[in-house]
């Protein structure tokens, strides 16, 4: 992993505030435009409304067991949103089977909708992927993906909500 990848951040933050700029999408995948919103931080509410596994993964940086969630091998056209805040994250057009047992994508739907931070847990350096709007842990990005980006956004299925295109 290059240092540039490890420190890259796509979140457009307004200086001195807790505002972030994201690209909004309709449920049929059409870009609605950029908007600036307050970052969502309501951990007590997350615990009440998420399943125990979704809370552990998204709020406590957990990882679901590979091949354990039904969404890992979904192939129909659609949009993947954050299970916590509904932010649009990935278009199914960029999803591919990485053989890992987790949903994998070669790019986010809009670079500003996710951000990446260095993750040094478990004695290794990786790049964690989070939702820009609510800071939910989504998974990690690796440099072993397919063209055109060479990236593998390896996401936890429980962190994503799939909306099929109509």
Describe these PLM feature segments.
Residues 1-12:
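N-terminal export signals
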Residues 13-28:
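Short N-terminal segments immediately surrounding and downstream of signal-peptide cleavage
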Residues 27-28, 32, 38-41, 45-81, ...:
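A short Gly-Trp-Pro
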């Amino acid at each position: 992993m290059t240092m540039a990848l490890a420190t890259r951040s796509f979140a457009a933050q307004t200086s001195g505030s807790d505002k972030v700029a994201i690209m909004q999408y309709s449920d049929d995948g059409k870009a609605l435009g950029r908007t600036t919103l307050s970052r969502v931080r309501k951990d007590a509410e997350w615990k009440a409304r998420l399943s125990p596994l979704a809370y552990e993964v998204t709020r406590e940086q957990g990882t679901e067991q590979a091949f354990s969630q039904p969404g890992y091998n979904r192939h129909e056209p659609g949009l993947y949103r954050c299970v916590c805040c509904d932010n649009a994250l990935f278009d199914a057009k960029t999803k591919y089977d990485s053989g890992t047992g987790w949903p994998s994508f070669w790019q986010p739907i809009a670079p500003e909708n996710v951000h990446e931070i260095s993750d040094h847990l478990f004695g290794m350096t990786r790049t964690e992927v989070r939702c820009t709007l609510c800071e939910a842990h989504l998974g990690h990005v690796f440099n072993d993906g397919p063209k055109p980006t060479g990236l593998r956004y390896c996401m936890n299925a429980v962190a994503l909500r799939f909306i099929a295109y109509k």
